Swiss-Prot record:
UniProtKB keywords: Cell cycle, Cell division, Septation
One family name in Pfam for this protein: SpoVG
Gene3D superfamilies: Stage V sporulation protein G
Family in the record: Belongs to the SpoVG family.
Gene Ontology BP terms: division septum assembly; sporulation resulting in formation of a cellular spore
Name of the protein in its database record: Putative septation protein SpoVG
InterPro entries according to UniProt: SpoVG, SpoVG_sf
């Protein structure tokens, strides 16, 4: 499975969250609301989550192995970096990221 499209929406609020992202997998399945977060060790990608009635945040969607997590994170962070370099106000679309697939 490959990340075939990434859309970045910059967040204009103060705080650690820098952007929201949507990814398309194999041109067939979209996952919205991934978050680009500034952590203590740099940027990372948080999966979309929902608060339970108990107040605990639970991922709505997430990769089930390290390879897919790396593909998602690398694709989103690359799109975010390009978006920041270009300083564009509109959404950035990165298509055909299949070239980053090691297989």
């Amino acid at each position: 499975m490959n990340v075939t499209d990434v859309k970045i929406r910059r967040v204009v609020a103060e705080g650690r969250m820098k952007a929201l992202a949507s990814i398309t997998l194999d041109h067939e399945f979209v996952v919205h609301d991934l978050r680009v977060i500034e952590g203590n060790s740099g940027l990372f990608v948080a999966m979309p989550s929902k608060r339970t009635q108990e107040g605990i945040f639970r991922d709505v969607a997430h990769p089930i192995n390290a390879l897919m997590r790396k593909k998602v994170e690398d694709s989103v962070l690359e799109a975010y970096a390009i978006r920041e370099e270009n300083g564009e106000a509109s959404e950035l679309e990165l298509a055909a990221l299949e070239a980053t697939d090691p297989s």
